[in-house]
Amino acid sequence: MSMPFELIPALSLKAKVVNSKPLKKGDAVGYGAEYHAPNDGYLITIPIGHSDGYPFNGSGMRALVADGQIGHIVGGVAMDQSMIFVTNPVAVGTTVTLIGRVGDQSITMQDLAEHTQSSIVALMNDFAPRLQRIIVS
């Protein structure tokens, strides 16, 4: 549908890496050790989980790392944190984008809704008050 105006995304969800550790091919992580690393890489942890409103079934979603890497959430989304598998090392403190744009890559609320078989409205309503809101003009 054509609009008489441009729509600009008005929301992003970002977190800083709090832990980063190397993984070897076949290493298992997550609830029930259900995820096995497909190759050598790194497991980074961010402090956003389903108690923040990020969907419990968000495992497999892309995550955009500030250094240009694209990772995937693995091992299930925990209550207060999520783990992301990446190929190259990532420093603690690096920004990870779960919703938003980094360079020419983006993850939208629609992407998350489709992946989790939910709706944008339901996802928005689930975001917890403890998530910091920054209003920009």
Language-model features: locations:
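Active-site anion/phosphate-binding pocket segments in diverse small-molecule metabolic enzymes
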Residues: M1-S137
